[in-house]
UniProtKB/Swiss-Prot annotation:
Pfam families membership: ACCA
Family the UniProt entry places it in: Belongs to the AccA family.
Gene3D superfamilies in the record: 2-enoyl-CoA Hydratase, Chain A, domain 1
Organism: Phenylobacterium zucineum (strain HLK1)
A single GO cellular-component term on record: acetyl-CoA carboxylase complex
Protein name from the UniProt record: Acetyl-coenzyme A carboxylase carboxyl transferase subunit alpha
Major subcellular location class: cytoplasm
Keyword ATP-binding set for record: yes
Length: 320
């Protein structure tokens, strides 16, 4: 179990601390004396975790989506992609490590894979800019998609970002234009593309690599135009809580599936993807494989037409 506990997991954390204490006593003072009680407490902790995660509200799901121990892009690549060769740079300005990508084999299929990487510790978070991509990151994504077309390869995107980087230098280098061009390339791509929202799907920074034929989302991930805290500040001037904003925004996987913004929810292990990363990544791999196999049977014209209709339908539903 991950050492990082969320606020709503505190009762579970207290119970697991007691289990750890009894385990130490059992090993030192009286070997085997507490085995029965330890097993009982472990079963109770598992039941508590299962019940808690079955009844998460929108704000709790937001916290889970941001959990630092959820699988990251580099983890998905290590688990699902063989012979991965990273490609760097946008051939215009620099290499942005907030978006990583390259070529590899996914369950025997040659693919182009790309995604946001947030980093896990201070050094890697700074290296990857906490997943906030700059213009060159999106231009690198465009370059990767152009390679996919050249070699007739499907594209798999992993989305996990709070948004594009809003700094002055980023604006000076045209981040809005880069996001727009990347979104356009996703929509007009002549090969199949699938996006998986694995944690946070924030604003244009997310949709720039998620305007795809199929959009999948993990059970406790979120997808929105702005973070709940930002919406609360802008729309309600801080008069509401972030939790109230999250509920009003309809950002959960379940809300998004009902509104047909995402195509499929991928179930997470009890306790979230961070509690069993291997099982979570296996589930993602199975879902992506199924979607890619269906899309590979379609020609370029059909792929583009279906993609366009998918996003037109989202716009039409918002006007009703």
């Amino acid at each position: 179990m991950a050492a990082h506990y969320l606020e709503f997991e505190r009762p579970i954390a207290d119970l697991e601390a007691k289990i750890e204490e009894l385990s130490r006593l059992s090993e030192t003072a009286s070997p085997g004396a507490f085995d029965g009680e330890i097993e009982s407490l472990r079963a109770r902790a598992q039941d508590m975790r299962r019940e808690a995660y079955a009844n998460l509200d929108a704000w709790q799901k937001t916290q889970v989506a941001r959990h630092p121990d959820r699988p990251h892009f580099v983890d998905y690549v290590a688990a699902l992609i063989e012979d991965f060769q990273e490609l760097r740079g946008d051939r215009k300005f620099a290499d942005d490590q907030a978006i990583m990508g390259g070529l590899g084999r996914f369950r025997g299929m040659p693919v182009v894979v790309m995604g946001h990487e947030k980093g896990r510790d201070t050094v890697t978070r700074v290296k990857h800019n906490f997943g906030y991509a700059r213009p060159e990151g999106y231009r690198k994504a465009i370059r990767l998609m152009e390679l996919a077309e050249r070699f007739n390869l499907p594209v798999v995107s992993f989305v996990d970002t709070a948004g594009a980087y809003p700094g002055v230098a980023s604006e000076e280098r045209g981040v809005a234009e880069a996001i727009a061009r990347s979104t356009e390339k996703c929509l007009m791509l002549e090969t199949p593309n699938v996006a998986v929202i694995t944690g946070e799907g924030g604003s244009g920074g997310a949709i720039a690599i998620a305007a795809t034929s199929r959009v999948l989302i993990l059970e406790h991930a979120i997808y929105s135009v702005i973070a709940p805290e930002g919406a609360n500040s802008i729309l309600w001037r801080g008069a509401r809580t972030a939790g109230e904003a999250a509920k009003a925004m309809k950002i959960t996987a379940q809300d998004l599936e009902r509104m047909k913004i995402v195509d499929r929810i991928i179930r997470e292990p009890a306790g979230g993807a961070h509690s069993d990363p291997e099982a979570a990544m296996q589930a993602v791999g199975d879902a992506v494989e199924e979607e890619l196999k269906a899309l590979l049977a379609l020609d370029a014209a059909t792929l583009k037409a279906q993609r366009a209709e998918r996003f037109y339908a989202i716009g039409r539903s918002g006007l009703q």
